[in-house]
Amino acid sequence: IEKGVRINTARIWDMSLISIGKGTVIGGRAVILGHLAEKGEMVFAPVKIGKKCLIGTSAQINPGCTIGDGAVIASRAVLKKYTHVPAGEIWGGIPAKKIKESD
């Protein structure tokens, strides 16, 4: 976790698999997972969140996701495992998809 990161009441599991860039804000009740159980097997994969991102309240970031610098993940959005969010994009929904590019 780099300097200037603000984390509200997030749940971050598997800290050794999670990187969060400078100036990112993680909203309350957001969940960031480096692992999950799938079909009786454990899946482990790193999560990389870039600089100056915003992860909304109650969003869920699953294993293997990468979020580019300045991207926004809307409140309650769920990123499926191994999702790549390019820099500067806004994603939302369940499952999350691109809504628009940030201004």
PLM regions and their residue ranges:
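Right-handed parallel beta-helix/beta-solenoid
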Residues: 15-16, 42
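Intrinsically disordered, low-complexity boundary segments flanking structured domains
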Residues: 18-19, 81
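Soluble cytosolic regulatory domains appended to membrane proteins
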Residues: 6, 19-32
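Extended, small-residue-rich solenoid/repeat segments and analogous flexible loops
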Residues: 1-10
